[in-house]
């Protein structure tokens, strides 16, 4: 794009330092230039393989290095995953994300992963996976199966990264994103607020994301979910205004990307979530959990949507179509969501 901005750290920090209301106004203006401000993309995330991850990410309850009480589960059978996808679609999701606690996928598991992608695609849903690092041929195989998105977060700035993770380098994360993009899969990549980072680190993360050769189509911004047994369990709470600022700056720096209000929503007030939508967030995960951490139930999300006049994207509804919203509400309330998970990684 001829008019694309390549951001400096100083420019990003200047955005964080703007008066709050000015920042919100700018973010909302930019959001309206690229998106319908009343539509929110809705995804569901399922943990298809839980626990026993060899990585040492200090925030993650699925690491084998920490005692967090997480039950370890092997890779789910394909039909189990497809059953969950059917329920997610019935509950209103348009994208089904599948996450596995691996450093990288094993070759023996690739045929099953391909079948999962093909099966979910056949339902008319978008597909996303987060499986750790990928080799070139693995990315190509997932692309051939029809995978739409691959999630691989950068987590934080390059400077702070080594304080949080030592078993995978920042460059390895960037290399995986490059392989995903090279295979023709859309990129989902973001980070976490509340790791103990500074505002400069938050700015540095967003600079890394915005200055990728092609910015991510989807940018999940997570609030740290503190889990007992992880090294970050006693971190200070994130000030809601600091989190909202991060959403707003992400929207300004990546105007055409979906900015996902991701992990941590269970601990946010409705008012904080509303301000995040005002700041430019236009995607959420919903379901009972995000991987292994709590997430607001679907009926609670829908009630908030109704209060704010928001519509789940691609529901075939016109603005204010209360009958359609009521039908969706009934689907959400009746859906069995116990196996759906909330994504922090």
Curated annotation (Swiss-Prot):
Pathway: Cofactor biosynthesis; biotin biosynthesis; biotin from 7,8-diaminononanoate: step 2/2. [4Fe-4S] cluster binds at residues 53, 57, 60. [2Fe-2S] cluster binds at residues 97, 128, 188, 260. Binds 1 [4Fe-4S] cluster. The cluster is coordinated with 3 cysteines and an exchangeable S-adenosyl-L-methionine. GO terms for molecular function: 2 iron, 2 sulfur cluster binding; 4 iron, 4 sulfur cluster binding; biotin synthase activity; iron ion binding. GO terms for biological process: biotin biosynthetic process. Its cofactor is [4Fe-4S] cluster; [2Fe-2S] cluster. It catalyses: (4R,5S)-dethiobiotin + (sulfur carrier)-SH + 2 reduced [2Fe-2S]-[ferredoxin] + 2 S-adenosyl-L-methionine = (sulfur carrier)-H + biotin + 2 5'-deoxyadenosine + 2 L-methionine + 2 oxidized [2Fe-2S]-[ferredoxin]. SMART domains: BATS (SM00876), Elp3 (SM00729). It is an enzyme of class 2 (transferase). It comes from the Bacteria. Keywords: 2Fe-2S, 4Fe-4S, Biotin biosynthesis, Iron, Iron-sulfur, Metal-binding, S-adenosyl-L-methionine, Transferase. Its EC number is 2.8.1.6. Residues 38-256 form the Radical SAM core domain. Belongs to the radical SAM superfamily. Biotin synthase family. Homodimer. Catalyzes the conversion of dethiobiotin (DTB) to biotin by the insertion of a sulfur atom into dethiobiotin via a radical-based mechanism. This is Biotin synthase.
């Amino acid at each position: 794009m001829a008019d694309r901005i390549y951001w400096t750290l100083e420019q990003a920090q200047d955005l964080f330092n703007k008066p709050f209301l000015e920042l919100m106004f700018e973010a909302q203006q930019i959001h309206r230039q690229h998106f319908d401000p009343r539509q929110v993309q809705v995804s569901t995330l399922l943990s298809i393989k839980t626990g026993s991850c060899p990585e040492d990410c200090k925030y993650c309850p699925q690491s084998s290095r920490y005692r967090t009480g997480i039950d370890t589960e092997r890779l789910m059978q394909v039909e189990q995953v497809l059953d969950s996808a059917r329920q997610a679609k019935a509950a209103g999701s348009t994208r089904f994300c599948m996450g596995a606690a691996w450093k990288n996928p094993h070759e023996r598991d690739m045929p099953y992963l391909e079948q999962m992608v093909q099966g979910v695609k056949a339902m008319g849903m978008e597909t996303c996976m987060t499986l750790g690092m990928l080799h070139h041929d693995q990315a190509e195989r997932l692309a051939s199966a029809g995978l739409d998105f691959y999630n691989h977060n950068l987590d934080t700035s390059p400077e702070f990264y080594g304080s949080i993770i030592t078993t995978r380098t920042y460059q390895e994360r960037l290399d995986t994103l490059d392989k995903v993009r090279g295979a023709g899969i859309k990129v989902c990549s973001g980070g976490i607020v509340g790791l103990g980072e500074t505002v400069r680190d938050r700015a540095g993360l967003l600079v890394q994301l915005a200055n990728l050769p092609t910015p991510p189509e989807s940018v999940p911004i997570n609030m740290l979910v503190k889990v007992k047994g992880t090294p970050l369990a006693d971190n200070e709470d994130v000030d809601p205004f600091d989190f909202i600022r991060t959403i707003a700056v992400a929207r300004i720096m990546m105007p055409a990307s979906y900015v996902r209000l991701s992990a941590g929503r269970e601990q946010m007030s409705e008012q904080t979530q509303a301000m995040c939508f005002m700041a430019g967030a236009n995607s959420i995960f919903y379901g009972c959990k995000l991987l292994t951490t709590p997430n607001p139930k679907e009926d609670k999300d829908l009630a908030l949507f109704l209060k704010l006049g928001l519509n789940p994207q691609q529901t075939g509804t016109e603005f204010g179509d209360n009958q359609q919203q009521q039908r969706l509400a009934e689907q959400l309330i009746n859906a069995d969501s116990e196996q759906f998970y909330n994504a922090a990684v």
